[in-house]
Amino acid sequence: MNRYCFTLRVRPDRLGEYKARHQAVWPEMLEALRGAGWSNYSLFLSDDGLLIGYVETPDLDSARAAMARTTVNGRWQQEMSQFFVDLGHGHADDNFALIPEVFHLEDQLARLRHRPGNTEEAFHV
């Protein structure tokens, strides 16, 4: 499973409504995301409108393409596009900026555990 992080910018005057919409995402949208391979998907929103998303999926391009083929995603993206800054001509799911991962605790611990000469006792504090 691959981990992806992305950013978008929500209009500061629409933060409250954006949050409210995400407290009751349409059930068919939730099912479409799951069916398209989106897992452990979270959104974080700062007071200045910076939106940070995190998702795990085997392949983000495939997961995005699967969502693009659903009618519910088109409706959701159309509904939500009013909340974002500088989307141009597309929807949010076409315009987010990916952020490269630079650290993952479990990956580094796993590499340490598999180094020659390391024992499991060395990792208990």
Where do the protein language model's features map onto the residues?
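Intrinsically disordered, low-complexity acidic/polar segments
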Residues: 15, 52, 62-64
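Short intrinsically disordered coil segments
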Residues: 23, 69-71, 115-119
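Glycine-rich beta-strand-turn "strand-cap" elements at beta-sheet edges
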Residues: 45-46, 78-125
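An amphipathic, aromatic/His-enriched active-site/gating alpha helix that lines ligand/cofactor pockets
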Residues: 36, 57-95
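Short, glycine- and small/hydrophobic-rich beta-strand elements in well-ordered beta-sheets
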Residues: 30-52, 56-58
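Short amphipathic alpha-helical segments
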Residues: 14-39
